Amino acid sequence: MESQQLSQHSPISHGSACASVTSKEVHTNQDPLDVSASKTEECEKASTKANSQQTTTPASSAVPENPHHASPQTAQSHSPQNGPYPQQCMMTQNQANPSGWSFYGHPSMIPYTPYQMSPMYFPPGPQSQFPQYPSSVGTPLSTPSPESGNTFTDSSSADSDMTSTKKYVRPPPMLTSPNDFPNWVKTYIKFLQNSNLGGIIPTVNGKPVRQITDDELTFLYNTFQIFAPSQFLPTWVKDILSVDYTDIMKILSKSIEKMQSDTQEANDIVTLANLQYNGSTPADAFETKVTNIIDRLNNNGIHINNKVACQLIMRGLSGEYKFLRYTRHRHLNMTVAELFLDIHAIYEEQQGSRNSKPNYRRNPSDEKNDSRSYTNTTKPKVIARNPQKTNNSKSKTARAHNVSTSNNSPSTDNDSISKSTTEPIQLNNKHDLHLRPETY
């Protein structure tokens, strides 16, 4: 019984224990109860081979290699010697292939020691219970996985503040080229968000929402190592890992910055291709906007020369600025600064002409007064003709009275009357009408 306890608590595996004994010890002193049947058969085979060669069998040749058990020497964590990842933690391509892996929903579902990669992500048993972060921490699952029907059996011994994992998360694809890293890191960030680790992802300002734990850092390092092999990483990622091979957070932060830069580049190109200017805004503001866009594109590796920039600017000119297309298109060596000198000249000329014009604006009341004065000029014509008619009517009455009383008046009066009747009557009007006596 004492030998059984020693064999159970020994840090060395049974295979190595059997390999360390000689053939003589196997036949004479070995207790068959100390090891299993399979180990006994291995020891007997090793002893038979040792007897035939008359030499002691080394441990490395006696025990067959077991790929699912790591020796104590390889289970330790060391700094990387060559490459961004430690050689002890690297996996073969068959082990890293996610096609045969089970989908998982939380870092604690993967049983491994810190900073050491397990041979495989073995699926947990049906009775296994794994803790999960509460809903207030991290990012919830955004979309259900196609394999969401597979669930774990609940256990009554779970803590009150922990819930069992009910959904699996699809792992990201394998990185196969350095050029695919920008697209791959997007899927990897989505994978972390679906794994309730959205809070540790750096935001726009480069800082995460919450502090990452040691277990989460281990999960981050291991998954990044498996899905992004070192030979397919870009140069800038290898430079970061060469300083600290566990600094995955810095890689994510730099990747997010590059994503934002790519988005800004696309927006700048669209803005530069759709420029419009007609003098409605100050020329200084328009020049600042265009030069800032060109400088950003040049700094990000998208070089815009003077010829292309001038063509894009002139294509968006309208109004009085449109003629610059025809006066400057023959100048092959024209720069953006020279083009903006012409734009400034036209803008200043427009502002000067606007300032020279009177700013007086006629009020509606003035227009009403003008209309009233116009009507008053026509009315005197009507009013001037009416008194004439009344005066003529009075003169007619007076003359008729004189005619009726002509018999009693002297002859001189008759002569004057007859003389006055033969003379034309002058009307004080504009038309200078001459009325004969027959019209009365």
Curated annotation (Swiss-Prot):
Homotrimer. Residues 153-165, 402-418 have a biased composition (Low complexity). The modification Phosphoserine is found at residue 416. This is Transposon Ty1-PR1 Gag polyprotein. Keywords: Cytoplasm, Phosphoprotein, RNA-binding, Transposable element. Coiled coil: none annotated. Induction: Ty1-PR1 is a highly expressed element. Induced under amino acid starvation conditions by GCN4. Retrotransposons are mobile genetic entities that are able to replicate via an RNA intermediate and a reverse transcription step. In contrast to retroviruses, retrotransposons are non-infectious, lack an envelope and remain intracellular. Ty1 retrotransposons belong to the copia elements (pseudoviridae). The gene is TY1A-PR1. One of its GO terms (biological process) is viral translational frameshifting. It comes from the Eukaryota. It is found in: Cytoplasm. The lineage of its organism: Eukaryota, Fungi, Dikarya, Ascomycota, Saccharomycotina. Residues 1-23, 48-60, 71-93, 127-152, 419-428 have a biased composition (Polar residues). Capsid protein (CA) is the structural component of the virus-like particle (VLP), forming the shell that encapsulates the retrotransposons dimeric RNA genome. The particles are assembled from trimer-clustered units and there are holes in the capsid shells that allow for the diffusion of macromolecules. CA also has nucleocapsid-like chaperone activity, promoting primer tRNA(i)-Met annealing to the multipartite primer-binding site (PBS), dimerization of Ty1 RNA and initiation of reverse transcription. Its main location: cytoplasm. The record marks 401-402 as: Cleavage. Residues 1-93, 126-173, 352-440 are annotated as: Disordered. It comes from Saccharomyces cerevisiae (strain ATCC 204508 / S288c) (Baker's yeast). Residues 429-440 have a biased composition (Basic and acidic residues).
